[in-house]
C-alpha cells in the first residue's frame, strides 16, 4: 500500500500491515532511521534502530498514526477506505 514519500517526517509514527508501529528518528540522504514496536517488534516498548531507504519505508507502511497508537485498541478507529 504505502504513504506518499513527501509525508514522511521526523517524529511521526506509521503503522505497517502487520500492526508494527514505526517512529521516524532521522531522515538523511534518502535514508530513514526508525525504531519500532508492536505486534512483532519488541511488544509495547520501542526497540532496536533500523535504517532503510525512504522509498522502502514509505512503501512498507500503511498510514500515519499517533505514536501512542495500539492496533489492538478501539480508541483509534480505522480510516474509511
PLM feature spans:
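Mixed-charge, Lys/Arg-rich low-complexity intrinsically disordered regions
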Residues: 1-9
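Short, charged beta-turn/beta-strand-edge "cap" motif at the junction between a beta-strand
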Residues: 19-22
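Basic/aromatic-rich interaction segments and small domains that mediate binding to polyanionic partners
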Residues: 25-47
Amino acid at each position: 500500500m504505502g504513504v506518499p514519500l513527501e509525508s514522511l517526517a521526523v517524529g511521526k509514527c506509521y503503522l505497517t500491515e502487520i500492526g508494527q508501529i514505526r517512529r521516524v528518528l532521522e531522515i538523511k540522504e534518502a535514508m530513514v532511521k526508525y525504531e519500532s514496536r508492536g505486534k512483532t517488534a519488541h511488544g509495547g516498548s520501542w526497540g532496536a534502530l533500523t535504517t532503510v531507504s525512504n522509498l522502502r519505508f514509505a512503501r512498507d507502511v500503511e498510514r500515519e498514526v499517533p505514536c501512542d497508537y495500539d492496533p489492538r485498541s478501539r480508541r483509534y478507529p480505522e480510516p474509511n477506505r
